[in-house]
């Protein structure tokens, strides 16, 4: 989960998770 205020799901699986412009992004 990206946390509160962050929507969407990660297209890539990774350990680093960031919330950019309210969207969830994962990085390997």
UniProtKB/Swiss-Prot annotation:
**Which portions of the sequence form the region Interaction with Ca(2+)-activated K(+) channels?**
17-24
- Tissue-wise expression: Expressed by the venom gland.
Cystine residue pairs: 2-19, 6-24, 10-26
Q: Which UniProt keywords apply?
A: Disulfide bond, Ion channel impairing toxin, Neurotoxin, Potassium channel impairing toxin, Secreted, Toxin, Voltage-gated potassium channel impairing toxin
The UniProt site entry described as Aromatic residue of the functional dyad is assigned to 27
Q: Give the GO terms filed under biological process for this record.
A: envenomation resulting in negative regulation of voltage-gated potassium channel activity in another organism
Q: Name one GO molecular function term.
A: toxin activity
Q: Where is this site: Basic residue of the functional dyad?
A: 18
Q: What is known of its domains?
A: Has the structural arrangement of an alpha-helix connected to antiparallel beta-sheets by disulfide bonds (CS-alpha/beta).
Q: What does this protein do?
A: Potent and selective inhibitor of Kv1.2/KCNA2 potassium channels.
Q: What is this protein called?
A: Potassium channel toxin alpha-KTx 13.2
User: Which species is listed as the source?
Assistant: Orthochirus scrobiculosus (Central Asian scorpion)
Query: Taxonomically, what lineage is the organism?
Result: Eukaryota, Metazoa, Ecdysozoa, Arthropoda, Chelicerata
């Amino acid at each position: 989960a990206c946390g509160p205020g962050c929507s969407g799901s990660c297209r890539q699986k990774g350990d680093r998770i960031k919330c950019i412009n309210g969207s969830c992004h994962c990085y390997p």
